[in-house]
Amino acid sequence: MRHTEFWERMTEALGSSSYATVWSEQQVMASLGGRTVQEALAAGESPKLVWRAVWENLELPMSLR
């Protein structure tokens, strides 16, 4: 998964790109080692791995996996 696809999915899941950005800066997730989405991506985690954590955290439907 590319970063552009990751952010498209975030926008789809959260309803707007601005909310997706804020959420990704503020929501700390244990599944990302106690980091935010932004921190995990900046540390080099793959967008696919980060998306999986977001998907599980938000309890999104399988169709958005």
Outline where the language-model segments fall.
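C-terminal alpha-helical interaction appendages
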Residues: 1-65
